[in-house]
Amino acid sequence: MTRLLLALVLALTTAVSFAPSASAELKVLVEGPGNFKPTPLAIPDLEVRGTNSDLARQIVEVVRADLESTGLFEMQNPASFIQKDLSIDVQPRFADWKIIKTDGLVVGAFEELPDGKIAVSFRMWDVYAGEVMRINGQPGRRLTTTPDNWRRIAHKIADSIYTRLTGEDPYFDTRIVYIAETGPKLNRVKRLAIMDSDGANQQYLTPGTNTVLTPRFSPSAQEITYMSYEGGRPRVYLFNIETGRQELLGNFPGMTFAPRFSRDGESVLMTQAEHGNSDLYIMNLQTRQSRRLTDHPAIDTSPSMSPDGRSVVFTSDRGGSPQLYVMNTDGSPRTCPSGGRDVACRITFNKGQYSTPVWSPRGDLVAFTKQLGGKFYIGVIGTDGTGERLLTEAYLDEGPDWSPNGRVIVYFRESRPGAGPQLWSVDLSGRNERRLQTQTEASDPAWSPLLQ
């Protein structure tokens, strides 16, 4: 039976943490010291066993770009390669790769199968140890698919390399939903749009007849919840990506906005505003029954649930200015970091205003937007209010969301007054800020789970 695995054998030494050694476990530090240097990695073109050399070359280009985008790897220039006659079935000449100071070498083959599918096999070598690094106990991996699905093969290859070298969960084979913005400011068109994590395959999901905001993926990555002004007032909707079906979620009085799925996908958290007061609600998607989470005269908004489903972080101005609070999902009192017990505990006490909190998939951090001194920041803080770190700074940085492995944050930025919004990402070290290319101006990004 054909194994839907990707033939990949990789081994690398990191110049960051230790000198090359045949006996040491090869790891790349995700959060290295201040003098961090990317690990040199060589990925030659695939050995083509067929006629479609263009597709084979494109697959390698995506793998290289994915890995280089992390800031952890330095892709060696193919023009510098001494050994040209590489084969997945033959051990490489390691001396040739040491000369150009390559720590890791990835060798692969591309095949066109009789049934019309394609297969990609990979082996990856530790240049200094002169040996293969096994993945899940196997010396290689192989993955097959239809030709039109070639980009997913590339992302899965990059995911395998990244995970084996860093020990972190993967995140390349994912999608990003966002708001595509066009037109003048007084007649702005805002549409739901979706793309691969690297910006490829961009498409619109809604026609732009109604303004939409704050899209969020379901845990299955098959549905999106968002706010739409359809019908003249902001309300929360569900959108099925496969069918294109849009559905109003509840018929609350007043307005509903800032939705987000629960971690199990069975409920949606949202804000409901009526008569000048905003509180948090959670709705069961099977029964369509809703339960009120907060009941306070202040403005409570932007709820995000912890990975275990037991807690919710949100923004409230109940202390006089927008700050971050944490509460138990069942509404019971909890012990607060500042001492005492309360239904909702404040976790931000530094200068500035805090908003749009998002709980990390790892459970240890909350990402947020901070406004202070005329500037905006994307930052992270421990769930107990300790260890605040600001990762970005700009005229306007807003709307963070996590990659599924909790190592990268996507957000949108306006670099100066009058500049249109663009999507950016940053890793937890704060040193790898990158702009994500979109066809239009873009805001309100959200990252999907890994695709199945």
PLM feature spans:
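Short beta-strand->alpha-helix linker/helix-N-cap micro-motif
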Residues: V30-R93, V106-E112
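Short loop/turn segments that connect beta-strands within beta-propeller blades
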Residues: Y128, D196-A200, N240-G244, N284-R288, ...
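A flexible loop/linker signature enriched in serine peptidases of the S9 family
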Residues: D169, E181-R191, P207-N210, M227-V236, ...
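Residue-level detector of Asp-centered blade-edge/turn motifs that repeat once per structural unit
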Residues: P170-F172, P219-S220, R263-D264, P307-D308, ...
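Hydrophobic beta-strand positions that form the internal "hydrophobic ladder"
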Residues: I176, I224, G265-L269, G309-V313, ...
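Blade-level signature of beta-propeller repeat domains, shared across WD40, Kelch, NHL, RCC1
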Residues: P421-Q452
